[in-house]
C-alpha cells in the first residue's frame, strides 16, 4: 500500500506494519508500513533538492499555492471532518471546527509573515538599512494526534510560506488524516519534493530528528517526547528547534456571583475534546467554605449529565472518546493511583463501554494527596484543590514545572491583575475558558511547556531567520576619512 509521499510520488513504506483504529468501534481505518531510515533519508534529500526552486519563488507565488490549498480544504471539508472524527473520536461538530481552523490558517499566516518577517528598510547615513528574512531550508514537522489537521498545519503553512521545504511525520495514531491533508496539498499544485510525508512511529521519528540533512524541527506533542528531542538536538545550535508541549494547567475560581457561568467555563476548560487539548484545565483551585462546596456540587451535577458518545452519534455528544484504549486505560490507572494516595472521588471517571475508548468526565479532590504528581493527565480527569486564601491559590497554581496556560474566574479586576502579574504561563485568561485562544496571538508556554518558540501567530518567527543589510547603489569614498588612513 502506497502511504508515503516522497519527491512527488506515493510509495509503500518498507518498515513495520501498523494500523489506525477508530477509538470507539476499534474498526481498522488505515493500514500501512512505516518509513525506514533509508526512506527518511530519501525524503530529506527530496526536500533539499526542491528547496532552491521553492525558496526562489516570489512570496505572491507561494501565497497562491497556499490559497489553492485552502480551496481544496473547503472542497473536501465534509470528507476531512469525517476523517478527523472517525480517527480521533471527536464529535463531528468539533471536527468541522478543526477544518475551519485549517482553512483560516492561510490568511492568518500571510498576515503574520508580512507583519513579523516581511521586508523593512530605511535611510542610514549614505546607505539604506534593510531587514529581510530567509527560510532555514529543510524542516521536519512532527504532528500530534489531538488536532491532526490543524496543529501540523500550524507549522507546515508558515514554513512553506517562508520558503522552506518540509518533511512531515504525523502521529502514528492519525495517519489517515495526514494522508488526506497531503492530498489537498497535491491538488493545490505544490511542486514535487516541497512537502514529503513519512508515516511511522517512534523509530521513524528518531531517524528523522537525527538526520543531518534537516535544518530544523517543529514539534507539537507531549513533554516527554519534546524533552527527548531537546536532548537529541543538544550541541546542534545550527538547527532551529521549536517545541510546543503540554501543561498541568491551573484554573482558579474566586467567589463569583454567577455560579452557572463558572460551571460552564470550568466544563469547557476541562472536558472539551475529552480533555485532550494541551490548554485544558488539569487542576481546579476552589476556595474552602460553603461557597466552594456549592460550586463543586453544581459542577458535579452538571458534569454527570454531559453527553459522551461516538463521533457520528446523533444527537451529537459534547465529548467523544480519547484517542485509544491504551490512553483510556492509562487515565483510569492514574485515577486509581490518586485515590490510593488520598484523593476523594467527587465524580468517578468511568469507561461506560468495554472495548471502547469512551470515558465519562471525572472530578476528584486531591487536596489531601501529600505529593501530587506534576503530570499532564491528557483526558477528562479534573483534579480539585481547595485553598484558604488568594495568595495561596496563586502559589498553588504556580507549583508546576509546566507553564502553558493558567486561568482565573473572578469578579475582581484587581485580583486578575495580581494573578496575571504572578502567573508563570504563556496563556493567561480571565473569565474565559482556559482552552480559548485568539488566532491573532502567539501560542506557547514556558518551563516544561516549550522552549520559547511560541507558535500560532508567532510561528513566522521560527520559520525564517533575519538578515540585516547595509546597501548602497554605488561604491564611493566617505566625505571624511577615518583618522590614520591616508589615500593619495
Curated annotation (Swiss-Prot):
InterPro entries: Ald_DH/histidinol_DH, Ald_DH_C, Ald_DH_CS_CYS, Ald_DH_CS_GLU, Ald_DH_N, Aldehyde_DH_dom, SuccinylGlu_semiald_DH_AstD. NAD(+) binds at residues 221-226. One of its GO terms (molecular function) is succinylglutamate-semialdehyde dehydrogenase activity. It comes from Pseudomonas savastanoi pv. phaseolicola (strain 1448A / Race 6). It catalyses: N-succinyl-L-glutamate 5-semialdehyde + NAD(+) + H2O = N-succinyl-L-glutamate + NADH + 2 H(+). Catalyzes the NAD-dependent reduction of succinylglutamate semialdehyde into succinylglutamate. SUPFAM superfamilies: ALDH-like. Pathway: Amino-acid degradation; L-arginine degradation via AST pathway; L-glutamate and succinate from L-arginine: step 4/5. This is N-succinylglutamate 5-semialdehyde dehydrogenase. NCBIfam families: arg_catab_astD (TIGR03240), PRK09457.1 (NF006992). It comes from the Bacteria. Belongs to the aldehyde dehydrogenase family. AstD subfamily. One of its GO terms (biological process) is arginine catabolic process to glutamate. The active site is at 244, 278. Pfam families: Aldedh (PF00171). Its EC number is 1.2.1.71. Keywords: Arginine metabolism, NAD, Oxidoreductase. PANTHER family: ALDEHYDE DEHYDROGENASE-RELATED.
Amino acid at each position: 500500500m502506497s502511504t508515503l509521499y516522497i519527491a512527488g510520488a506515493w510509495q509503500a513504506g518498507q518498515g513495520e506494519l501498523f494500523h489506525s483504529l477508530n477509538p470507539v468501534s476499534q474498526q481498522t481505518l488505515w493500514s500501512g508500513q512505516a518509513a525506514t531510515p533509508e526512506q527518511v533519508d530519501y525524503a530529506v534529500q527530496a526536500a533539499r533538492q526542491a528547496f532552491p526552486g521553492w525558496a526562489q519563488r516570489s512570496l505572491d507565488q507561494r501565497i497562491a499555492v497556499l490559497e489553492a490549498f485552502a480551496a481544496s480544504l473547503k472542497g473536501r471539508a465534509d470528507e476531512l471532518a469525517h476523517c478527523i472524527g472517525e480517527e480521533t473520536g471527536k464529535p463531528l461538530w468539533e471536527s468541522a471546527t478543526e477544518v475551519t481552523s485549517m482553512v483560516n490558517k492561510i490568511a492568518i499566516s500571510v498576515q503574520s509573515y508580512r507583519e513579523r518577517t516581511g521586508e523593512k528598510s530605511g535611510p542610514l547615513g549614505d546607505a539604506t538599512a534593510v531587514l529581510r528574512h530567509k527560510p532555514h531550508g529543510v524542516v521536519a514537522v512532527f504532528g500530534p494526534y489531538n488536532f491532526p489537521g490543524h496543529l501540523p498545519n500550524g507549522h507546515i503553512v508558515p514554513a512553506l510560506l517562508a520558503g522552506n521545504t518540509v518533511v512531515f511525520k504525523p502521529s502514528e495514531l492519525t495517519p489517515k488524516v495526514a494522508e488526506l491533508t497531503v492530498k489537498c496539498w497535491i491538488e493545490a499544485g505544490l511542486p514535487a519534493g516541497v512537502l514529503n510525508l513519512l508515516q511511522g512511529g517512534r523509530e521513524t521519528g528518531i531517524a528523522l530528528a537525527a538526520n543531518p540533512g534537516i535544518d530544523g524541527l517543529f514539534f507539537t506533542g507531549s513533554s516527554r517526547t519534546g524533552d527527548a528531542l531537546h536532548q537529541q538536538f543538544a550541541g546542534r545550535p545550527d538547527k532551529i528547534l521549536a517545541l510546543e508541549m503540554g501543561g498541568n494547567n491551573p484554573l482558579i475560581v474566586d467567589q463569583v456571583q454567577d455560579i452557572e457561568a463558572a460551571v460552564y467555563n470550568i466544563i469547557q476548560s476541562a472536558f472539551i475534546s475529552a480533555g485532550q487539548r494541551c490548554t485544558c484545565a488539569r487542576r481546579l483551585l476552589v476556595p474552602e467554605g460553603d461557597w466552594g462546596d456549592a460550586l463543586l456540587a453544581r459542577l458535579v451535577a452538571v458534569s454527570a449529565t454531559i453527553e459522551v458518545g461516538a463521533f457520528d452519534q446523533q444527537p451529537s455528544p459534547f465529548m467523544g472518546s480519547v484517542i485509544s484504549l491504551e490512553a483510556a486505560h492509562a487515565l483510569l490507572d492514574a485515577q486509581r493511583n490518586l485515590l490510593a494516595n488520598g484523593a476523594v472521588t467527587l465524580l468517578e471517571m468511568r469507561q461506560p463501554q468495554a472495548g471502547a475508548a469512551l470515558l465519562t468526565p471525572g472530578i476528584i479532590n486531591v487536596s489531601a494527596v501529600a505529593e501530587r504528581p506534576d503530570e499532564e493527565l491528557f483526558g477528562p480527569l479534573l483534579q480539585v484543590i481547595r485553598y484558604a486564601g488568594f495568595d495561596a491559590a496563586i502559589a498553588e497554581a504556580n507549583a508546576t514545572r509546566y507553564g502553558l496556560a493558567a486561568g482565573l474566574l473572578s469578579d475582581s479586576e484587581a485580583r486578575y491583575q495580581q494573578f496575571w502579574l504572578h502567573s508563570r504561563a504563556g496563556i493567561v485568561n480571565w473569565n474565559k475558558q482556559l482552552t480559548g485562544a485568539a488566532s491573532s496571538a502567539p501560542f506557547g508556554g514556558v518551563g516544561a511547556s516549550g522552549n520559547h518558540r511560541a507558535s500560532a501567530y508567532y510561528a513566522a518567527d521560527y520559520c525564517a531567520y533575519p538578515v540585516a543589510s547595509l546597501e548602497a547603489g554605488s561604491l564611493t569614498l566617505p566625505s571624511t576619512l577615518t583618522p590614520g588612513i591616508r589615500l593619495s
